[in-house]
């Protein structure tokens, strides 16, 4: 799922359920968040060694690995742990490579995947009911479409400007951390023009050529191959 859609919260809920309903001791629950600076230079071998060190000798260990795509080769680590030890693994990630055929090859028959989305309209109403009175459905639907469904924007009553600030921060972290940094994009202004076009044409059919033609008309020409390259990076 996309950044800030609630993946980490879902992991925490599973951990709490294991402790409360299944009496799993906390010593057998291991949680790591790999977008932390603590793991910035970690290799797959180091990841494997660290997790192996934290496995419980007294029964199944439950491993919760958040934003695992930050570690190159993480899928080999997960496969090795699943093969060699008594573990139950839960992993999250923020890009489409989590669903790639390469990963499926490593983990064949050993995983179930879930796509996590932002709040549905029904979930939005449920969130809102915790801190204020819910209005007429049509009015609430307009607000939902305008403000979006990121959980962080509906944890309390925010002004429209505050919501836009939160969403802008999520956008910036997605563009700069997940796309620019990972793909070493140098011409960020070009990428943002392509992003803006796609946002403005949600629900419409478009191609790399139509984007290129539009930007050319705006005197900001980009060739088809460059546009396609940016779209490919955005998709991943």
Task: Go through each PLM region and give its residues.
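Walker A (P-loop) phosphate-binding loop of P-loop NTPases
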Residues: 3-4
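Walker A/P-loop
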Residues: 8
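Short glycine-rich substrate-engagement loop in P-loop NTPases that contacts/grips substrate
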Residues: 28-61
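Short regulatory helix/loop adjacent to the ATP-binding pocket of P-loop NTPases
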Residues: 80, 97-113, 127-129
């Amino acid at each position: 799922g996309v950044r800030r859609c609630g993946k980490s919260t879902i992991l925490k809920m599973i951990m709490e359920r294991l402790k409360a309903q299944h009496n799993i001791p906390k010593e057998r629950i291991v949680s790591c968040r790999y977008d932390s600076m603590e793991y910035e230079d970690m290799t797959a071998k180091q990841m494997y060694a660290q997790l192996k060190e934290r496995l419980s000798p007294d029964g199944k260990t439950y491993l919760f690995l958040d934003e695992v795509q930050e570690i190159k080769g993480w899928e080999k680590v997960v496969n090795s742990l699943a093969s060699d030890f008594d573990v139950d693994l839960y992993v999250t990630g923020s890009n489409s490579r989590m669903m790639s055929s390469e990963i499926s090859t490593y983990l064949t028959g050993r995983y179930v995947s879930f796509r996590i989305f932002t709040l549905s309209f029904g979930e939005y109403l449920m969130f809102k009911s915790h801190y204020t009175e819910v209005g007429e459905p049509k009015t609430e639907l307009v607000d939902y479409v305008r403000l979006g469904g990121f959980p962080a924007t509906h944890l309390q009553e925010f002004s429209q400007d505050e919501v836009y600030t939160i969403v802008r921060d999520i956008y910036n972290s997605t563009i700069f951390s997940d796309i620019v940094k990972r793909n070493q994009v140098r011409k960020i202004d070009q990428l943002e023009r392509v992003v803006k076009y796609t946002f403005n044409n949600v629900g419409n059919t478009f191609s790399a050529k139509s984007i290129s033609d539009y930007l050319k008309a705006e005197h900001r020409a980009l060739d088809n191959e460059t546009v396609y390259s940016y779209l490919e990076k955005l998709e991943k």
